[in-house]
Regions:
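Short, hinge-like loop/turn segments at secondary-structure boundaries
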Residues: 23-26, 49-55, 138-140
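Anionic-ligand binding region
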Residues: 30-73
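Catalytic-core segments of class I nucleotidyltransferases/pyrophosphorylases
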Residues: 56-130, 136-148
């Protein structure tokens, strides 16, 4: 299908109003979006590097790279503007050896970018997103969330 779609990892909790992001998707139907939040932990995140402090992505990496620091850590919420284009990009990615020994969803955006597609970030607030993929993350979330 050439319809847009969203893929969300299962190891995080989101509590944010998506109205702004939905408007961006509607206003820019040929753009794909990746949500990010400010974090620098290279052991837990992929990163979206943007051009000149804009929302336009020029590269996604599993680690921050020398000479290209960023704190745009991906959240695991991935929007693709076109399912057919997504499939083509995934097939290109899978035809290459995996970076760091495994494939990452964020790397699909590099294939989109290489083929001239528009990829943008949408920043979310740290108080509306909690990673829960490790025991430490889960304990942090439950301690903060259930003490409200």
């Amino acid at each position: 299908s050439s319809k847009p779609f969203i893929s969300v990892n299962c190891d995080q909790v989101f509590e944010w109003d998506t109205t702004s992001l939905q408007k961006k998707m509607k206003d820019n139907p040929k753009s794909s979006y990746i949500t990010v939040y400010p974090h620098t932990d290279t052991q837990r995140h992929s990163f979206a590097h943007t051009k000149d402090n804009t929302d336009k992505v020029w590269m996604c990496t599993e680690k921050t790279t020398a000479g290209h620091p960023t704190n745009n850590a991906t959240t695991g919420f991935y929007h693709f503007h076109n399912g057919k284009v997504f499939n083509e990009s995934v097939n290109k990615l899978l035809s290459k050896p995996p970076e760091f020994g495994e494939y990452y969803v964020a790397a699909v955006y590099n294939e989109l970018i290489n083929d001239g597609h528009d990829v943008r970030i949408d920043k979310i607030h740290t108080k509306t997103f909690w990673p829960v993929g490790t025991q430490h993350d889960w304990q942090h979330f439950t301690h903060r969330h259930y003490r409200r």
